[in-house]
């Protein structure tokens, strides 16, 4: 994975342009809020890829996996998990990939609150 911080006014347009050029070799996603981060990974390598590997090694069914996300680079992970949750501050493009949207943001400790309410 390579992370690039860009000065581009529109990181989404830049990512789209780069994806069209490198579409057979790389996945290019955006994240970082105001930081304008582009995440470049080899085609087919993403968070769900890593989670699938770990689940296989640990002999855990993916239905027992919950995932939390807020940006484009979380799409595959939320789709892959048994339950995928988008944060309140999630990029709207991520919402179709989530089973549910949490009522709190990252900054409001939304994941910790969710885990405490559900499991403690």
Name each region found by the language model.
Residues 1-66, 72-75:
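Conserved acidic, metal-coordinating active-site core of Asp-based
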Residues 41-120:
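Mg2+-dependent phosphoryl-transfer enzymes with acidic/Ser/Thr/Gly-rich catalytic loops
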């Amino acid at each position: 994975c390579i992370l690039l911080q860009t000065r581009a006014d529109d990181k989404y347009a830049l990512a789209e342009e780069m994806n069209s050029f490198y579409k057979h070799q790389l996945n290019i996603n955006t994240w970082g809020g105001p930081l304008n981060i582009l995440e470049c990974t080899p085609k087919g390598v993403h968070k769900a890829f890593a989670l699938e590997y770990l689940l296989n090694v640990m002999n855990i069914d993916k239905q027992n996996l919950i995932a939390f996300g807020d940006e484009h680079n979380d799409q595959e992970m939320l789709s892959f998990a048994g339950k995928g949750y988008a944060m309140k501050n999630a990029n709207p493009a991520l919402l179709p990939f989530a089973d549910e949207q949490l009522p709190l943001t990252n900054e409001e400790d939304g994941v910790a609150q969710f885990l405490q309410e559900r499991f403690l």
